[in-house]
Amino acid sequence: MSSSRKILDAPKKFREKLKDFNEERKKPREPITTKASMFSIFSWAFYDLGNTIFSVLIVSFYFGLWVVSDEVGGTDSDYGYANAISMALVFLTAPLIGALSDQARRKMPFLFVTTLLCVAFTALLGYEKDGWSKSTILTVSLIFFVIANYFYQAGLIFYDSTLATISTPGNKGRIGGIGIGVGYVGALVGILSALFITDTLGFPYPAVFQLTAALFLIFAIPCFIFVRETPGDNFWPSLMILMATLLGINAWLVENNMLLRYTTVFFAIWCVFSS
């Protein structure tokens, strides 16, 4: 078929696709409560609200502001390096976490542990003891940030996999959309709360870190309690698949050592531009 013929047929194919799309839209949609109640769905979505508060207040705004404040005298580079290190750790361990998430009979225990660790180290940001210098306070908090952000990112992998617990292929997109929408509410809640305690009440930035930890935990609790998993009886087959996956990842990394070099260069460039 000539190129001119393809151009002439394009409007016809577009109309056919549009017709198929409209016919698909007319079909009755599967209710979002097919697999779980609306209460369970919003309990799941509230976790998204909580972790968005962490993302906005800690990763995007207040921790970086605290690092460069006169209180500790850090630089943008200090925060950039810490963020790069935490993301590098996520990048290197994501295949293992993903394999574990895919093959584990229950995801919620892993989500619970990663969330608690993130919350604990978030609450410790800005921690200081009598006699500590500014550089010591900064270094300790940067280490805590690396750990908190790592477990936040790891928790996202397990959280996303729990969507299958409350959804079906027919309503997964809409339920996921509810989580995203509730997450945007979390951004607003976090910013307004932080502004209130810093600008109105006059608390220092570390109070925002503790507030973030508390809000994250509070909004995560409904997900842990009311989202019920139904684990199957395939423990040993899943364990075998998991081990085979991990061995396959290890073999691939050994054979493709270029990945390590690429990762090193990538994060070196990131650190340079962050400084």
Where are these regions (language model features)?
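C-terminal ends and interior cores of transmembrane alpha-helices
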Residues: 115-134
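Cytoplasmic helix-loop-helix junction between adjacent transmembrane helices
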Residues: 150-181
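Glycine-rich segments within core transmembrane alpha-helices of 12-TM secondary carriers
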Residues: 174-195
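Central cavity-lining transmembrane alpha-helices of secondary-active solute carriers
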Residues: 81-99
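C-terminal membrane-cytosol helix-exit motif in multi-pass small-molecule transporters
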Residues: 194, 214-232
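Helix-loop boundary and gating motifs at the non-cytosolic
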Residues: 29-87
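Cytoplasmic membrane-interface "Motif A"-like loop-to-helix N-cap segments
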Residues: 101-116
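Hydrophobic core of transmembrane alpha-helices in multi-pass small-molecule transporters
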Residues: 121, 134-155
